[in-house]
Amino acid sequence: LQKNKKPTTKMKNPLLLIVLLIVSKAIAQNDQKTAFQKSRYELAVSYYKKADFKKALDLFHIASRIKPETEIGKESMQKIDTLKNVLREAILTQALGTWKMIGDKPVWAFNQKETGKEKESDEFIAITPSEILFYEKNKKTQEKKIIKTESLVYYNKDASDSLYSDIILSDGTIWNCSINEDSDQLRVINVGKKTDNGVEKIESNNMELFYVKVK
């Protein structure tokens, strides 16, 4: 009987080479991720120091997602939490007060006097630090009719996301809110709905409403 021959060095070398290539590639990719994460973090810090909190938040979000287990990843998460609170306080300060709904188009897009004649009542929202009051006001009698009251609840898909101005209502609808620089126009867009099966994201034909500040 022939004895089994031991694998020769020539047979071992290709296998060793393949393993080394795989390991080297993994190390290189890891180094690239680390370098990219560091660059995003440092850029975020520079925007943070300039008080450009929106750009800083977006960059900290990117840095936190690349390698969340690193010190930079953990530090980015802490900055995200801080910046969300800062930005929410800023937009809430702008939002406090009473707003009149003008429709699904911004102020400059239509003649408000003409569209206003079609309705018997105007729709309003009154925003406080903790609640949103929806009500109607009859144009002739000036009588107010409360539609509903909602708690002001911010929505986060996850802790590391960069969303800070999304709110969720009791029916599960999620609305992105934005206010112009003069703090007199509010725009809300229905971006999703939370159900028992999770969050359904709305990416087209989104319901959109515009408000002007009256008080």
Indicate residue ranges for each PLM-predicted region.
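Short consensus segments that form the blades of beta-propeller domains
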Residues: 113-116, 199-201
